[in-house]
């Protein structure tokens, strides 16, 4: 004889939740991946003393909506003294206008003599610009190759000495 056992209906628990929060921080970075030290053998009163190599500059970004442009600049902290003498008693400096940069192997070598957004000295050169168009390139990167010259005709009485300086490379996005 068979007895009927009724199947029990499923029982559901309450609903538990987990809140998920994710943040992608805005970033704009510049890295010199090669050519972090450039040497020059200078000749007096010579317009084109070439640097020993090139620098590769990578600018990468992850931006918030509303940004519309990225500008990459090379600049010195002083227009009058981009490179300073090593020898005590030598007070002659190489100005930023004597340092010239060619970008990506094309066009002229241009002096570092413009005002950058990073300091008021007329010691900079914009080396790149990227327009941001909506969300099509809000995350991206650009690579620029810089070649260098020092024009010693800018300082016709430049004494024999070693001269050292630091070229800053920085990017800015707007607005």
Go through the PLM ranges and name each one.
Residues 1-3:
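Bacterial N-terminal signal peptides
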Residues 111-113:
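Sequence contexts marking disulfide-bonded cysteines in secreted/extracellular proteins
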Residues 115-127:
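Signature of long, low-cysteine stretches enriched in small and polar/charged residues
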Residues 7-109, 129-175:
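N-terminal small/polar-rich segments of proteins
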């Amino acid at each position: 004889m068979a007895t009927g056992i009724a199947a029990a209906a499923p029982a559901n628990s309450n609903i538990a939740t987990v809140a998920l929060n994710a943040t992608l921080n805005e970033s704009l970075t510049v890295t010199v991946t090669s050519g972090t030290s450039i040497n020059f053998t200078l000749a007096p009163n010579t317009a084109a003393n070439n640097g020993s190599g090139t620098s590769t500059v990578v600018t990468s970004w992850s931006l918030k909506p509303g940004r519309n442009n990225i500008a990459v600049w090379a600049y010195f902290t002083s227009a009058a003294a981009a490179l300073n003498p090593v020898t005590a008693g030598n007070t002659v400096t190489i100005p930023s206008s004597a340092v010239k940069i060619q970008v990506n192997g094309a066009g002229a070598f241009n002096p570092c003599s413009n005002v950058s957004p990073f300091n008021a000295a007329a010691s900079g050169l914009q080396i790149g610009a990227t327009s941001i168009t909506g969300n099509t390139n809000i995350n991206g990167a650009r690579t620029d190759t810089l070649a260098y010259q020092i024009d010693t005709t800018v300082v016709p009485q430049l004494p024999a000495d070693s001269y050292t300086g630091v070229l800053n490379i920085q990017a800015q996005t707007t607005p």
